[in-house]
Amino acid sequence: MMNRLLVFLMLGAAFMLVVSAIDQDANDINKRGVPCLCDSDGPSVRGNTLSGIIWLAGCPSGWHNCKKHGPTIGWCCKQ
């Protein structure tokens, strides 16, 4: 009985560790946003820095649209 309890507690602790790590990754993405390729970055994503951030509802104050044609969803904005 005691061994089953210990196994249950260890599995619960491992599950909580995984869930907290996934949550931290999601928070980092929310703060950073999804990078996109501005026109000033060059023609290809290979070897170029992605200096823009995709915003779904238009560029916020202090940012400008840095790509003439799309992404398909949202705007590629740069400070």
UniProtKB/Swiss-Prot annotation:
What GO cellular component entries does it have? extracellular region; nematocyst
Entry function = Binds specifically to voltage-gated sodium channels (Nav) (site 3), thereby delaying their inactivation during signal transduction. Has a strong effect on crustaceans and insects and a weaker effect on mammals. It strongly inhibits D.melanogaster sodium channel (DmNav1). It weakly inhibits the brain sodium channel Nav1.2/SCN2A. It strongly affects the heart sodium channels (Nav1.5/SCN5A).
Please provide the record's keywords in A-Z order.
Answer: Cleavage on pair of basic residues, Disulfide bond, Ion channel impairing toxin, Nematocyst, Neurotoxin, Secreted, Signal, Toxin, Voltage-gated sodium channel impairing toxin
Q: Which family does it belong to?
A: Belongs to the sea anemone sodium channel inhibitory toxin family. Type I subfamily.
* Protein name (Swiss-Prot/TrEMBL): Delta-actitoxin-Avd1c 4
Pro-peptide positions on chain: 22-30
Q: Which Pfam families match?
A: Toxin_4
Q: Which Cys residues form disulphide pairs?
A: C36-C76, C38-C66, C59-C77
**What else is on record for this protein?**
This protein is encoded by at least 3 different genes. At least 3 other genes code for a similar Av2 with an Ile (instead a Val) at position 34.
* Transmembrane stretches, start-end: none
According to its UniProt entry, this protein's organism is: Anemonia viridis (Snakelocks anemone)
- UniProt subcellular location: Secreted; Nematocyst
Q: Which InterPro entries match?
A: Myo_ane_neurotoxin_sf
Annotated GO molecular function terms are: sodium channel regulator activity; toxin activity
The signal peptide here is 1-21
